[in-house]
A protein has these predicted regions:
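Extended cationic-aromatic binding surfaces that line active-site or macromolecule-binding grooves
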Residues: 1-22
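Bulky hydrophobic/aromatic packing residues
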Residues: 2, 6, 56, 99-101
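Residues in flexible loops and secondary-structure boundaries
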Residues: 5, 10, 27, 121-123, ...
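Structural motif
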Residues: 6-10, 51-59, 151-155
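Short secondary-structure capping/turn micro-motifs that flank functional sites
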Residues: 18-19, 35-36, 139-140, 166
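Alpha-helical ds-nucleic-acid-binding substructure associated with the helix-hairpin-helix region
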Residues: 20-92
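C-terminal accessory module of base-excision DNA glycosylases/AP lyases that mediates lesion recognition
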Residues: 58-70, 77-85, 90-174
Length: 174
């Protein structure tokens, strides 16, 4: 919920670290409010030795507070991946990519793929995905194609999408 269009990975990571340092990830008391999260996100972040401001602190604080409330109720325990993704996507700000990210990183599941613009473009260049497919509109179809491709080359989807993302990101930085 911290990342997305217009937020660089490094800034996202710094914001995540800030929330973790403040106890957001450990809290279970329900004491963390939208206002508290906003104040944490408004403080300048250290990114590669530079102070930067986080984009969209108000919107993200609202979304994180709502998500925090949902997780406090343990609403998602014991759900299968398909049901869990649907439940996650019912929360404002969570689309198929973020839901897949949560499922992958919280459950260690390889039943999902994290398809972002980097993976989309790379797979289109390799002719794995059709050129006319777009995110988020075609996410589920793209994910199925990616999972089939991953199985065909005998590479875990979690490894394949991470490697593609990393390599495309590095190539763009050059």
């Amino acid at each position: 919920l911290l990342g997305g269009f217009g937020i660089k990975y490094e800034v996202n990571f710094a914001a995540f670290d800030r929330l973790d340092e403040k106890g957001f990830l450990d809290a279970r008391s329900g004491s963390i409010t939208e206002e508290t999260i906003r104040s944490w996100l408004l403080e300048p972040l250290n990114v590669n030795g530079r102070e930067v401001r986080y984009r969209f602190p108000n919107q993200r604080a609202r979304r994180l507070a709502r998500m925090y409330g949902k997780f406090q109720r343990d609403e998602f325990e014991g759900l299968d991946v398909t049901t869990l993704r649907s439940s996650l996507m019912s929360v404002e700000g969570i689309g198929p990519k973020t839901a897949s990210w949560i499922i992958r990183n919280c459950l260690g599941s390889d039943e999902v793929a994290i398809i972002d613009v980097h993976v989309l473009r790379a797979c289109q260049k390799m002719k794995i995905f059709p050129e006319n497919f777009r995110l988020p509109r075609d996410y589920e179809a793209l994910e199925q194609m990616f999972l089939h491709f991953s199985a065909a080359i005998n590479v875990r989807p979690s490894v394949l999408d991470a490697v593609i993302w990393s390599e495309v990101r590095k190539a763009r930085a050059v």
